[in-house]
Amino acid sequence: INNKWGRVINFSSSDGSKGDVGTAAYTSSKLAIHGINKVISKEYAKFNITSNVLLLGNFNFGMFKSLSRAKQNELLNKVPSKKHGHIKNIYNAIEFIINSDYVNNSEIKIDGGL
């Protein structure tokens, strides 16, 4: 706030708001990220601070990597390109947000078109 500039980048999931059976804890935690993003983006805009959410799909690390090969294939088959994302896709989105002073309260999907 003292610098009158900042970027808040929250991470969520492109599946996080679907609300499938058995995902109450996961879904509510992801929706909480969306809610706090909305508040931050409005409260801190006057300080030139923006807040956005990256909605990630299947990337070959984290939760995806811990899944069985069969489950990974099942998830990848839902992606139109049939492949997982690369970390450079996330880096590119972060760079875009950092350099954009008018992108605020946005939810940017990086999920291969899910």
Where are the regions a protein language model picked out?
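C-terminal substrate-recognition "lid" of short-chain dehydrogenase/reductases
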Residues: 5, 83-110
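Hydrophobic structural elements of the Rossmann-like NAD(P)H-binding subdomain
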Residues: 9, 51-54, 64, 105
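Residue(s) in the substrate-gating loop at a strand-loop-helix junction
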Residues: 13
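Short, flexible catalytic-loop segment of classical short-chain dehydrogenase/reductase
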Residues: 17, 34, 55-66
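Active-site helix of classical SDR
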Residues: 29, 37
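Alpha-helical segment proximal to the catalytic Tyr-Lys
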Residues: 42-46
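Conserved SDR Rossmann-fold cofactor-binding beta-strand/turn motif
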Residues: 50-60, 109-111
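Catalytic Tyr-x(3-8)-Lys segment
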Residues: 70-88
